[in-house]
Amino acid sequence: MTELRVAFRTLGCKLNQLETESIADRFAASGARIVPFESGADLYVINTCTVTGKAEQKARRTIRQALAACPSSVVLVTGCYAQMDPGAISALDQRAVVVPGDEKARVLDLAAWLDSHWQGHGDLLHAVLEWRSGMSVPSTPIAPLASITLSIPGVTGSASQPGADHFAYHPNAFSFHSRPGLKIQDGCDNRCTYCRVCIARGSSISLASPEVLSRVRALESSGKAEVVLTGVNLAQYRDGNLRFPELLRMLHEGTDRIAFRISSYEPEKIDEEFLAAFALPRIRPHVHLALQSGSDSVLKRMARPYTAARVRQAVASLRAAKEDPFVGVDLISGFPGETDVEFAETLGLCRELDFAWIHAFPFSARPGTKAWDMRPCVPERIAGERVAILGALAHSGKASFAARQAGKTLDLVLEQSAAGSDGLSAPFRFGTSANYLKICVEGVPPGIRAGTAVRVLVSADTPENTPESQVELDPEHSDSDLHARFLGLA
């Protein structure tokens, strides 16, 4: 195949990031050249999100940018927004080819199809449309409570589309991340009143535990130091009677060196079984809780199955299980009817529990959810002010957590110094610590590659003029890096 330039942009969750990595891996294996999104590309692949209205606006803006970058390029759009509103995307331009989220796994086959059928001859758009028309299962929107039993080996649960392999995403190489993710669960059985991810991704399904272990062992054998266990709702992982805590134990017992990071978890599921697994040595001291509010009355309107008291108990238990773990939370501000008193309850809980990070965002009414029609609406200005207050608390909490690391010896995984570049001789290297801090490391010997676990000594100072622009930082860490000195391999 004539060298095809392909660029990728991922919007939304870690699950989307992993799925994009897998698609990029297939293109790279076929001989395509993966290029930065800002560069000219023949094919753009955009993996979208539908969690908020702003996420959809960002998706449309990104699509338009790709269309404008090169008049002959093809822009393939997939993901949750493509699932929920394919017509709005198709209307942007004839070069915007939509693959709804429930068919996303089929994009994994596009590179091989182009290699066999297109081979660089003729119009790329015509070729992609021909491939798209040959996809065997037509996409239909997922009903909120739809549940179709799967018949795929190694998968348990239900899904929106029979025969769709929701767990085909397992790249051999990672183009955009040094710490690989592993998708073990998809979909959600909760019906939170504000969320339509359950509509876009369907009911909960899980990758069978023997296959999870097999994939983790493959990552460990390839030299990966850490794997991020990823799903829409990890607390709903099921393989028969085996739940997520038992899976963690099985993975820990079945491997030798690789560490495990939990992408996110539900507060009410922080129970004795989870805590026992969390306390295991190679489970990273980091949990991100889907809190959403600290007010019992707001949580009830959200249909969240816990109270502020349960959150207090969960956080205290996490801190008892591991020394000073990184505990972050998601919060929605301006949920319909949220009063000043209710917001004060949320703010008070956050101050009391001193979270290491708060990801706060304003409520966005989503079509098809119960909250769409809830009243009274909180004015956008007030919701924004509340987000700003929580944001300030987030940064002070992160700074306090980071300051407690001064003088400590930490393990971390080195990151790439630039998209697709190891930066083996860079004066500074960046890495993500076991407790989820972005750290600038000095004195790393040349030749140590991204993805390697190293041990560092954290100093109290942050280096000036470090090349932070060379690394694509996680937004949670872009303003709170620490400085450390390389001690050796971990």
Per-region residue spans from a language model:
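Contiguous mid-protein beta-loop-alpha structural module that forms a pocket-lining wall or clamp
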Residues: 338, 353-355
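Conserved SAM/AdoMet-binding glycine-rich loop
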Residues: 75-76, 84-85, 220-343
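Residue-level signal for inorganic ion chemistry
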Residues: 45, 80, 229, 262, ...
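Short, solvent-exposed loop/turn segments at secondary-structure boundaries
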Residues: 55-57, 203-208, 238-242, 301-304, ...
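Terminal RNA-binding accessory module
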Residues: 373-490
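Short, hinge-like loop/turn segments at secondary-structure boundaries
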Residues: 93-94, 115-117, 246-247, 278-279, ...
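Proteins enriched for Cys/Gly/acidic motifs involved in redox and nucleic-acid/cofactor modification
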Residues: 1-230, 235-236, 287, 309-320, ...
